[in-house]
Amino acid sequence: MIKEGFLIKTPKKLIALLGPSGSGKSALSIELAQELDAEIFSLDSLSIYEDINIASAKPSLKERKNIKHYALDYLNIDEKNNASLFKTLLEDAMRVSSKEILLIVGGSSFYLKSILEGLSGMPKLSDEEVVKIEREIATLSNPYIFLKSIDPNMAFKIHPNDTYRIHKALEIFYATHTPPSEYFKANPKKPFEHAISLFALSVEKNALANNIKQRTKSMLDCGLIEEIKALYIKYPKDSQPFKAIGVKESVLYLEKRLTLKELEEAIISNTMKLAKRQNTFNKTQFNNLYMGSVGEIRHAILKHSKSDTRER
């Protein structure tokens, strides 16, 4: 029930456009936004940071002037992003957008899955408590083995290489002194209340490899090293973005641990591995997801949006 004088404006249609790095999501999203008179919510764990423009392949200022983008330039480099933050920003965008359609565009599919399935609220911690917990976790020789010892049920659900989820589980343990599985029982997930139509780009392997090579070369030509150098001087070395592809290799170059040629090769290789993981995730982790080429997805989204609008 809406209280008198309090109206939440939400887009009538939420459409997610997913796809691996280098698949052409950004270019297609701009085209679609223009044709559908839509706005764009950026679901990207790097574009959310200020001052990371080249490494994140962030939309240009001209593109952003013509089409409203949300969740760009929101965090400083030394702040952390997570699924809960993206959910909050998405709900904020839904409230303020006056358009019929909001396109959710990005490669951070794990965050979208977490939002759709629902998030359990994390314990509220002060900055001092966060630092203390981070130190505790850093002293563990094998975080996964420790998690297994305190909460076998939770450890069973997490792959030993899934450092993100292991870390989150241990944060809960140190913050609450409760096994994470018990904490989640007491704080159940709340599924997302709004329907999101899911589409994902699937690009042929050789074409994707060529896109990634061209993109990497372009990033280096546009000043990637200079961009990361400015951040490396200014911010703590353990800041979350310094672990991202394109950034971490540039740091190794700045530390003279890679040559320029090795830097380019490392970014290409790591991006291709990431793209493979993203593709697999999109294929296996979503129900009712439509996958196809750029042309197929463009046609499917336009048809889906326009028929839906006519029905209303």
Curated annotation (Swiss-Prot):
The keyword Magnesium applies. It holds the Pfam family IPPT. Gene3D superfamilies: 1.10.20.140, P-loop containing nucleotide triphosphate hydrolases. Its cofactor is Mg(2+). Its EC number is 2.5.1.75. It is an enzyme of class 2 (transferase). ATP binds at residues 19-26. Monomer. PANTHER family: TRNA DIMETHYLALLYLTRANSFERASE (PTHR11088:SF60). Belongs to the IPP transferase family. NCBIfam families: miaA. This is tRNA dimethylallyltransferase. It comes from Helicobacter pylori (strain J99 / ATCC 700824).
